[in-house]
Regions:
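Short, positively charged, Gly/Tyr-enriched micro-motifs
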Residues: 92-193
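Short, conserved DNA-binding cores of transcription-related domains
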Residues: 1-104, 110
Length: 194
């Protein structure tokens, strides 16, 4: 038996794109009990390919939509392209990300001086999805950092994290939670300690 996996993306503008992923082969005559169904390695590979197809299409759409200036609706020029490695729960994906020139009408140019705009930086400020960062923080708070990295490598197709990456992301998530708690004026902070 051969299984083919195809993904079809329909963009907001109506354009359609088809991605052909790797197939899975399970010949009947050589099937053993271990070869029944989808194995962990097969699942990790397929999910990683699905993630790559979806993320690349999303990045393309983000860049296309970001080219339109929000102030005057003119199309901003592309400054250059850079490759970015984006860490997701289902794998590390290398994408080609455009940086855009600032529009001449941009009223915020004085407030935000600088060169090209990277639309991808808004969605991936740490080049990792928030879901992956939360999982690193969750596992890092429950296990040693090395064990958390080992667990992720065993069960997920994501790029195997180094234990220091788990530690650093736990620290950033904790700092973000602390910052949002202080900004909300948490009454628990006003209570006397001890």
């Amino acid at each position: 038996m051969d299984v083919r996996i195809t993904i079809e993306t329909t963009f907001d503008n109506g354009e359609k794109r088809t991605h052909q992923l790797d197939g899975i082969s399970r010949p009947y005559r050589v099937t053993c009990p271990d070869g029944i169904g989808l194995r962990l390695e097969d699942g990790k590979r397929v999910v990683e390919q699905i993630q790559r197809a979806i993320l690349c299409d999303q990045v393309e759409e983000i860049i296309r939509e970001s080219r339109v200036c929000p102030d005057c609706a003119s199309v901003r020029a592309i400054h250059d392209y850079r490759t970015r490695d984006l860490d997701t729960l289902f794998g590390r994906v290398r994408v080609k990300a455009a940086r855009l020139r600032r529009c001449s009408c941009d009223a915020r140019s004085a407030a935000m001086p600088g060169g090209p705009i990277s639309p991808l930086a808004y969605f991936f400020p740490d080049r990792a999805t928030p879901e992956l960062q939360r999982l690193h923080a969750e596992l890092g708070s429950r296990h040693s950092f090395r064990e958390a990295a080992r667990l992720m490598k065993s069960f997920l197709p994501c790029h195997p994290p180094h234990h220091t990456t788990v530690r650093d992301r736990l620290g950033r998530v904790a700092a973000g939670l602390e910052k949002s708690r202080r900004a909300s004026g948490d009454p628990a902070e006003a209570l006397p300690k001890g």
